[in-house]
C-alpha cells in the first residue's frame, strides 16, 4: 500500500511539473526593454496601405525602407535611433528599429499590431508615445510617408486632398497637429515625404510641433526621398533641416534632364524647402498688414501670373511670394519689408527648372516659384473648402474673415 502511495505521489509531482512547464511555454511574450537615452530618435511613419487602387505605393515604400537601411550604415548608432512605423498592404502594422550590430544594419521588429487606422490621431499618438518610451532621446524628428495634399479637409473620396491615405480615408491637418503633441517637446524637424505639404497654412498650423518643416510645395517625385543620402542628415546637429533638404534635392538634381522619367533614375525634377517655425508668427503679422492694405473684395483676387503648384480641381496652392508681390508690386516698401521676413522663414529652397505633375502628366515650369504655397480664396463663403479654411490658424492670424469674408 505504501509503495502504491509513493507511485501515485510521484505521478502527481511529475504531472505538476509538466503542467508548470506548459504554463511557462505559453506565457505572454517578454516586452522589450527601453533603450538608454540617445541624442536623437527619428520616427518614420509610413502609411502605404491605401487600398487596391494605390497598391503601388507600398512597393515604393519598401524600396524607401531598404534605402533607410543603407543610410544607417553612415550613422553613429550609439547616438541615435531610427524607428519605422510600417503600415503596408499585405502585411501587419509593425514598429521596427533599424539598428547596427557591429558593422551590420538590421531591421528589428519591436511590436506588431492588430489592424488599425494609422491616420486615426489616437493610433498615431499611441505609436508616438510608444516610440518615446522605448527609444528616449534628447531630441526627436518625424518623417511622414504617404499620399497627401496640403491643408484641405479629409474626405472619404479616393485621391481627395488632406494628409495621408489609408484605405481611402484621410486625416485633417488639425488632427495631425494634435497627434504630434504626444512627443515630449517640439520636434527638431518634420520631413513630409508626400505631396504639396510645404504650404504656409500647414507650417503655421504645426509651428508649435517642430522647429523646422521640410517638404515640397508641389508634387514630390514618385520614388520619394533618397533615404540612403537623407538618413545621415537626420542626426546632425548644425543646420539639420537645410542639410536634409539639400540631400533630398541634390540627388534628383544630379539626374535631372527635364524629361519625363521612364525606367531608371527619376529625371523629371524636384523642389524642396525648409521653413523655420519660430519666424512664422512674424510672417503672419506682416501678411495681415499686407492683406488689410491691399485686398478688396473677394472677386478682385487674381491668380494669373502667379506660380501654380496644385494641378488638381481644387486649385488650392499658389506661390505665397508671388501672391503678395502681385498685391503690392515688388518696388513697394511694404513688400520689401514682408520679403525680408519671408526670407528669414524659408531657410532653404531649391528647385529644378521644371517639375512633373502626375495629375496632368507633364512637366511644368517652376520659374516663378519661391518654395512656400498659399491658398488664394475664391468661391462661396460657405463652400466646404472655405468653411474649413476659416478654421485654420493661418486664416485667423492674417485676418481673412475681417478682410475678405466680411
Where would I find each of the regions flagged by the language model?
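Terminal, contiguous helix-loop blocks that mediate binding/assembly
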Residues: 28-30, 133, 157-406
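Short alpha-helical segments and helix-capping/turn motifs at coil-helix boundaries
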Residues: 26-29, 53-73, 121-133, 199-200, ...
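Cell-envelope and extracellular/periplasmic
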Residues: 34-62, 66, 87-91, 114-115, ...
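Loop/turn elements at helix/coil->beta-strand transitions in domains of secreted/extracellular proteins
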Residues: 38-41, 76-82, 136-141, 184-189, ...
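Catalytic-core segments of thiol-dependent peptidases
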Residues: 87-108, 116-183, 194-195, 200, ...
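Sec-dependent bacterial lipoprotein signal peptides
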Residues: 1-19
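Bacterial Sec-dependent N-terminal signal peptides
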Residues: 16-39, 376-378
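Glycan-recognition patch characteristic of GH18 chitinases/ENGases
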Residues: 45, 56-122
Amino acid at each position: 500500500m505504501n509503495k502504491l502511495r509513493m507511485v501515485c505521489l510521484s505521478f502527481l509531482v511529475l504531472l505538476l511539473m509538466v503542467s508548470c512547464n506548459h504554463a511557462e511555454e505559453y506565457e505572454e511574450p517578454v516586452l522589450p526593454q527601453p533603450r538608454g537615452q540617445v541624442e536623437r530618435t527619428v520616427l518614420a511613419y509610413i502609411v502605404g496601405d491605401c487600398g487596391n487602387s494605390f497598391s503601388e505605393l507600398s512597393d515604393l515604400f519598401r524600396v524607401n525602407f531598404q534605402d533607410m537601411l543603407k543610410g544607417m550604415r553612415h550613422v553613429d548608432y550609439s547616438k541615435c535611433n531610427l524607428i519605422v512605423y510600417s503600415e503596408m498592404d499585405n502585411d501587419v502594422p509593425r514598429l521596427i528599429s533599424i539598428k547596427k550590430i557591429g558593422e551590420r544594419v538590421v531591421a528589428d521588429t519591436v511590436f506588431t499590431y492588430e489592424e488599425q487606422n494609422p491616420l486615426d490621431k489616437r493610433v498615431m499618438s499611441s505609436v508616438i508615445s510608444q516610440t518615446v518610451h522605448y527609444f528616449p532621446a534628447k531630441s526627436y524628428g518625424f518623417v511622414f510617408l504617404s499620399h497627401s495634399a496640403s491643408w484641405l479637409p479629409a474626405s472619404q473620396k479616393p485621391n481627395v486632398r488632406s494628409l495621408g491615405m489609408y484605405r481611402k480615408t484621410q486625416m485633417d491637418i488639425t488632427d495631425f497637429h494634435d497627434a504630434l503633441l504626444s512627443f515630449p517637446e517640439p520636434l527638431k524637424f518634420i520631413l513630409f515625404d508626400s505631396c504639396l505639404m510645404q504650404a504656409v497654412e500647414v507650417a503655421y498650423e504645426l509651428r508649435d510641433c517642430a522647429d523646422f518643416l521640410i517638404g515640397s510645395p508641389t508634387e514630390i517625385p514618385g520614388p520619394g526621398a533618397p533615404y540612403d543620402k537623407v538618413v545621415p542628415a537626420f542626426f546632425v546637429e548644425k543646420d539639420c533641416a537645410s542639410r536634409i533638404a539639400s540631400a533630398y534635392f541634390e540627388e534628383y538634381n544630379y539626374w535631372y534632364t527635364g524629361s519625363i522619367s521612364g525606367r531608371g533614375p527619376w529625371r523629371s525634377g524636384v523642389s524642396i524647402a525648409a521653413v523655420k517655425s519660430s519666424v512664422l508668427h512674424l510672417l503672419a503679422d506682416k501678411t495681415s498688414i499686407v492683406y488689410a492694405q491691399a485686398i478688396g473684395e473677394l472677386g478682385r483676387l487674381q491668380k494669373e501670373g502667379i506660380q501654380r503648384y496644385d494641378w488638381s480641381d481644387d486649385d488650392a496652392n499658389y506661390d505665397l511670394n508671388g501672391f503678395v508681390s502681385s498685391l503690392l508690386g515688388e518696388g513697394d516698401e511694404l513688400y520689401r519689408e514682408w520679403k525680408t521676413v519671408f526670407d528669414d522663414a524659408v531657410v532653404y529652397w531649391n528647385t529644378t527648372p521644371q517639375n512633373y505633375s502626375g495629375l496632368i502628366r507633364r512637366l511644368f515650369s517652376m520659374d516663378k516659384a519661391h518654395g512656400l504655397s498659399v491658398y488664394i480664396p475664391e468661391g462661396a463663403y460657405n463652400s466646404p473648402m472655405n468653411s474649413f479654411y476659416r478654421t485654420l490658424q493661418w486664416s485667423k492670424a492674417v485676418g481673412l474673415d475681417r478682410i475678405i469674408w466680411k
